[in-house]
Amino acid sequence: MKKGAKRKGVSKAGRKAAVAETQNDEVIEETTKTTQEESQQHEEEVVDEVKENGEEEEAKGDQEEEEDAKPDSLEEDEENQEDEVKAEEVKEEVEKKPVARRGGKRKRATKKDTEIKDEKKPVPKAKKPRAAKVKEEPVYFEEKRSLEDLWKVAFPVGTEWDQLDALYEFNWDFQNLEEALEEGGKLYGKKVYVFGCTEPQLVPYKGANKIVHVPAVVVIESPFPPSDKIGITSVQREVEEIIPMKKMKMDWLPYIPIEKRDRQVDKMNSQIFTLGCTQRRSALRHMKEDQLKKFEYCLPYFYQPFKEDELEQSTEVQIMFPSEPPVVCEFDWEFDELQEFVDKLVEEEALPAEQADEFKEYVKEQVRAAKKANREAKDARKKAIEEMSEDTKQAFQKMKFYKFYPQPSPDTPDVSGVQSPFINRYYGKAHEVL
């Protein structure tokens, strides 16, 4: 009987353990289904723990074999109670075991937790309606003309430094100059030398007369530079100076049209040269007054050997007698008689009577100097012609001067009534005014 009881107990304990394992597997399978992200490794650990519990139960069943057999009814009740307790313990351990998830442990949020979190979230503010953006129309800039800035590049020789800004007060239109140098124009393909000048004029503008510094551009058609010298002269200066351009930081520079400035160009093959000045305006305040005034008295110099100079023909001299106040006048040695000239000045109280004799000597000195200069100029002209090659002679004889004024436009004063062919005392008059 004892052996049978023991075998019966062992079989019951085995069946109970199998039932417990089945229940644990169902719990694990159910947990796996609800959380698809559970790692496979952790599942195997849970199953191993359950199996270990089953082995412990089998070991306990073997120990029961060694114990004395109990009555069947009591033994069955005790075994049932022990199996139920163990099954509940295994179930509790599985439920208590935290389920591993990828990315770390997290607690499953309950409905209550979700409601609490929703209460803590700030109520989003109502966004203001955005105003519809107005599509801006594209702005088109007028393409610059190839020679548009030529008149600005040509330095306005003889203009006072503080008047340069007034010269560019208006956007002057020099398309007539551009057209003459472009294809189809009278100067197209010809080598030219360009310089600027200014002429203060009283012109009508917006219903009123206004003094305006009118720009003009002089173009010399020549195969070589017309001159490399600058003349410095004025009524206030007693002596006229003819000096090299470079002493005044001026020179003939090749002009590059706007359309060619973005690539390398052979400047030596340029057809347009402008008289440029490299003197920086910022350095003028450190310059002496006499040197500064020289820029204002500069005139582009030109010597035409085949045309008698106006100085050679003139019989007048500029008189600036040093007295208080200075006596400034002109004396013509062919038409004026010196004694009558002096008496008239004394009578008009322009000259003190006690300085009459001194004034006479001063005038005679000026006349002698002027006559000497005329003789020297004639001799120099004859010598230059003798030493000149035939090509140079022909170039001088074919040389032409053109003077350009700005065209009328709505934004600029009308200068059509003040145009003049006169350039300066050295160049004389232009062959054509455009």
Curated annotation (Swiss-Prot):
Compositionally biased residues, Basic and acidic residues: 30-53, 83-98, 111-122
Regions of compositional bias (Basic residues) in chain numbering: 1-15, 99-110
Highest taxon above the source species: Eukaryota
Region Disordered, residue ranges: 1-131
Motif (Nuclear localization signal 2): 95-102
Disruption phenotype annotation: Embryo lethal in homozygous plants. Hypersensitivity to heat leading to the inability to withstand prolonged heat stress (4 days at 37 degrees Celsius), probably due to impaired heat-induced chromocentre decondensation associated with attenuated heat reactivation of various transcriptional gene silencing (TGS) loci.
Major subcellular site: nucleus
Position of sequence motif Nuclear localization signal 3: 370-377
Any single Gene Ontology cellular-component annotation: nucleolus
GO biological-process terms attached to the record: heat acclimation; negative regulation of gene expression, epigenetic; negative regulation of heterochromatin formation; regulation of cellular response to heat; response to heat
Coiled-coil regions listed: 363-394
Keywords: Coiled coil, Nucleus, Stress response
Cell compartments where the protein resides: Nucleus; Nucleus, Nucleolus
Presence of keyword Coiled coil: yes
Function (record text): Essential protein required for basal thermotolerance, especially during heat-induced chromocentre decondensation, thus regulating transcriptional gene silencing (TGS).
Protein's name in the database: Protein HEAT INTOLERANT 4
Species of origin: Arabidopsis thaliana (Mouse-ear cress)
